[in-house]
Amino acid sequence: MQDAAPRLTFTLRDEERLMMKIGVFVPIGNNGWLISTHAPQYMPTFELNKAIVQKAEHYHFDFALSMIKLRGFGGKTEFWDHNLESFTLMAGLAAVTSRIQIYATAATLTLPPAIVARMAATIDSISGGRFGVNLVTGWQKPEYEQMGIWPGDDYFSRRYDYLTEYVQVLRDLWGTGKSDFKGDFFTMNDCRVSPQPSVPMKVICAGQSDAGMAFSAQYADFNFCFGKGVNTPTAFAPTAARMKQAAEQSGRDVGSYVLFMVIADETDDAARAKWEHYKAGADEEALSWLTEQSQKDTRSGTDTNVRQMADPTSAVNINMGTLVGSYASVARMLDEVASVPGAEGVLLTFDDFLSGIETFGERIQPLMQCRAHLPALTQEVA
């Protein structure tokens, strides 16, 4: 029998406030986000990600995001040793979708801002105005050392100064088609980009440190943050409150989008058994690599994304918030997420993406009050 879970009761005014956007964090790297020998083992391919994003679009997901990873963690699972490239993948996905928003990630140490501006304008054309850019500063030193472009460990403390100049160049080029920006890191001399995007280009970030949030408050359209714990859907609330306060100080409205993994089944016990199975197969060698990398940055404080990822509490899925339970239980927990001030959306991963998205669309989302505004489903995608 499916576990019963109490439904939250909201007034109409609350329901309007609690409409929440849903995105999928596509598996651009092998094995998704489970560092376990017991998890599904697969390589990233365009066909897999096309199927995932088309299915997400069918179930009225609002957006799809891909990360960028240039070197993996190794171990028995070769975790993230095999990765596609974000902009080219999302350009392809933009061409085979029609409604869902598409976001690629720029590893800003590897790509000059003028090139990113032009690539983004191109995918804007492909997608019909559905594209945006996620900017990351880079935290894993070996990704950049292997190419000879690591700027030195002082970069850890200056990376948001670098990103501030980077985004100013982007905004110049997208907004006016030219830039003469002069800074410590970038010098533009009548730099031109045309055509410009058809709509204002959205910029997103994932800052959890004070410096990261200050940057997002000033320049981002919204900010990603990690969920926290297992079946503690509102534990991220202090992070969202910090982001909300930082944005208010900048005179802007920058919502938080929260990262969660969904592990669902018919009953709470069945879902919990999956989760325990994945944890029992944790790839300790790959996890050791993650821990080692998290200790390289001694300049950014203790509140960075990578420090949370490496926390041994739930490193098997990089410590993103984890929702484990029956379909009704997961729906209830996601409605709780939507009730947190400043939380405007969630970015979801799944233990098995194709079946997970289908189960979410058919069995979980219909129970969510914060998604009650959605239209009826059309015929299933092929």
UniProtKB/Swiss-Prot annotation:
Induction line: Up-regulated by the nitrogen regulatory protein C (NtrC also called GlnG) and repressed by RutR.
Enzyme Commission (EC) number: 1.14.99.46
GO BP annotation list: alkanesulfonate catabolic process; nitrogen utilization; uracil catabolic process
GO molecular function annotation: alkanesulfonate monooxygenase activity; uracil oxygenase activity
Classification via SUPFAM superfamilies: Bacterial luciferase-like
Residues annotated to bind FMN: I68, K69, N134, E143, R159, Y160, S209
InterPro entries: Luciferase-like_dom, Luciferase-like_sf, Pyrimidine_monooxygenase_RutA, SsuD_RutA_monooxygenase
Catalysed reaction equations from the record: uracil + FMNH2 + NADH + O2 = (Z)-3-ureidoacrylate + FMN + NAD(+) + H2O + H(+); thymine + FMNH2 + NADH + O2 = (Z)-2-methylureidoacrylate + FMN + NAD(+) + H2O + H(+)
UniProt keyword annotations, A-Z: Flavoprotein, FMN, Monooxygenase, NADP, Oxidoreductase
Similarity comment: Belongs to the NtaA/SnaA/DszA monooxygenase family. RutA subfamily.
Role played: The FMN-N(5)-oxide reacts spontaneously with NADH to produce FMN. Requires the flavin reductase RutF to regenerate FMN in vivo.
PANTHER family membership: ALKANESULFONATE MONOOXYGENASE, ALKANESULFONATE MONOOXYGENASE-RELATED
Protein name: Pyrimidine monooxygenase RutA
Species annotation: Escherichia coli (strain SE11)
